A protein has these predicted regions:
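Mid-domain alpha/beta scaffold segments of enzyme catalytic cores
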Residues: 1-79, 99-101, 122-123, 130, ...
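Catalytic pocket-lining loop regions of alpha/beta-barrel enzymes
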Residues: 61-167
C-alpha cells in the first residue's frame, strides 16, 4: 500500500556485484531502506577516450562477462531485486549477452545504452546510430530488460537528436 505522506517509494542502491559479501551488503541496504529497496544500480560505463564522460572508480572493461559479476546479477533476481545499468553504445552487445545469461533478473537499461556523439565518435554519428538501433532492437527481445528513459537531453554526448528517435 502506498502512503501518500511518504516522499520516497523505492530505493535503487549501489553494491559491488562481484563481492563475496554481496548478501550481507544487500541485507544492510534492505534494513536501511526499511522495505523500500527495489534494485541495485552499477554503472558499467567504460570510457575508451578522454573526451567521453569518465567517472573515477568506474567499471573495468569486460565486467559484464565476469563470472562473479554475473553471479551477483543472478543473485539480485533470486532476491526479487532488479539490476540497473548504464553504459555506452559499444557495450550494448556485452549487456545483451548478460541479459541472455541471467534471464531471471529484471534489468533496467539506463539512458538507452548511450549512443555517443562526442570526441572520436562525433564524425561517426550516423554509423553509430544505425548500429545502436540494431543493438537496441536485439536487447528489446530480452523479456527481462526494460529501458529507463532518462538522460536523453544531455547533448552533445548523444549521437542523435530527438528528431531521429522514430524507429
Amino acid at each position: 500500500t502506498r502512503d501518500p505522506e511518504r516522499l520516497i517509494s523505492a530505493i535503487v542502491a549501489h553494491a559491488d556485484l562481484r563481492s563475496p559479501r554481496l548478501d550481507e551488503v544487500l541485507e544492510a541496504h534492505e534494513a536501511a531502506g526499511r522495505g523500500l529497496l527495489r534494485g541495485i544500480r552499477d554503472a558499467l560505463s567504460h570510457a575508451k577516450h578522454p573526451e567521453v564522460l569518465r567517472i573515477p572508480g568506474r567499471a573495468p572493461a569486460g565486467l559484464y562477462a565476469d563470472p562473479a559479476f554475473r553471479a551477483g546479477v543472478a543473485r539480485l533476481g533470486e532476491r526479487g531485486l532488479s539490476y540497473d545499468t548504464w553504459h555506452y553504445h559499444y557495450q550494448n552487445p556485452e549487456m545483451l549477452e548478460l541479459a541472455r545469461a541471467v534471464p531471471g533478473t529484471t534489468m533496467v537499461l539506463d539512458h538507452f545504452g548511450t549512443p555517443l556523439g562526442v570526441g572520436p565518435y562525433a564524425s561517426q554519428r550516423d554509423e553509430i546510430f544505425e548500429q545502436w538501433k540494431l543493438d537496441i532492437a536485439a536487447i528489446a527481445h530480452c523479456e527481462n530488460v526494460v529501458a529507463k528513459f532518462g538522460g536523453m537531453a544531455m547533448p552533445p554526448i548523444f549521437a542523435t537528436t530527438f528528431s531521429q528517435w522514430a524507429m
